[in-house]
């Protein structure tokens, strides 16, 4: 089953800060919903374990993620695959673009596709797509909160 997602998010910091955060394993580990492990294996390649709940199905996916077509601080492509054991297998990728906005922040846009099989695919397109969108929204909400300028820091300077 193929799943397509796209979205835009406004972040309150520069592209350079957003790009650096999106390449920082500590930031990613903190912001990815259900992320239990995220380790750098080599330049641009991460190994991950993510706990996922899709409707009645709960599983852990173990997989690899690769950052490709790096164009700092403008864009990159992320691709990966994960094995959820009896729950199924997922493989996909996303293109991310970072554009400065008029207020000194960044407009992040993405287009993602994933191919899913196994028990997860049997849950249906609507549930998988809506859950995937919620996971993306939670990730970007966490990222925004993490990158939010701290008013106390600005006042104390």
Describe the residue ranges of each PLM region.
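Solvent-exposed residues in well-ordered beta-strands and their adjoining turns
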Residues: 10-14, 51-55, 68-70, 81, ...
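Hydrophobic ligand-binding cavity/cleft-lining segments
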Residues: 1-45, 49-53, 103, 154-157
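Glycine-rich portal/gate segments that line the openings of hydrophobic small-molecule binding cavities
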Residues: 39-82, 138
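Beta-strand/loop substructures that line and gate deep hydrophobic ligand-binding cavities in soluble
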Residues: 82-131
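Glycine-rich, flexible loop/turn motifs
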Residues: 28, 34, 53, 57, ...
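Intrinsic-disorder/low-complexity, polar/charged segments enriched in Ser/Thr/Lys/Arg/Asp/Glu/Gln
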Residues: 2-8, 45-47, 60-62, 75, ...
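A conserved amphipathic terminal alpha-helix motif
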Residues: 119-156
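Hydrophobic/aromatic beta-strand elements that line small-molecule binding cavities or substrate pockets
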Residues: 7-9, 35-36, 63-69, 92-100
């Amino acid at each position: 089953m193929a799943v397509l997602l796209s979205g835009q998010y406004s972040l309150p910091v520069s592209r350079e800060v957003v790009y650096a955060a999106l390449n920082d394993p500590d930031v990613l580990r903190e912001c990815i919903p259900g992320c239990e492990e995220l380790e750098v294996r080599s330049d641009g390649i991460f190994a991950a374990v993510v706990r996922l709940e899709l409707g009645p199905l709960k599983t852990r996916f173990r997989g690899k993620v690769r950052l490709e077509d790096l164009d700092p601080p403008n864009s990159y492509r992320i691709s990966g695959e994960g094995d959820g054991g009896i729950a199924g297998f997922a493989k996909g990728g996303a293109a991310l673009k970072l554009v400065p906005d008029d207020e000194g922040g960044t407009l992040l846009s993405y287009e993602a596709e994933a191919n899913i099989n196994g028990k997860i695919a049997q849950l249906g397109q609507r549930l998988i797509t809506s859950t995937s969108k919620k996971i993306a929204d939670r990730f970007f909400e966490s990222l925004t909160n993490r990158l939010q300028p701290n008013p106390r820091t600005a006042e104390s300077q």
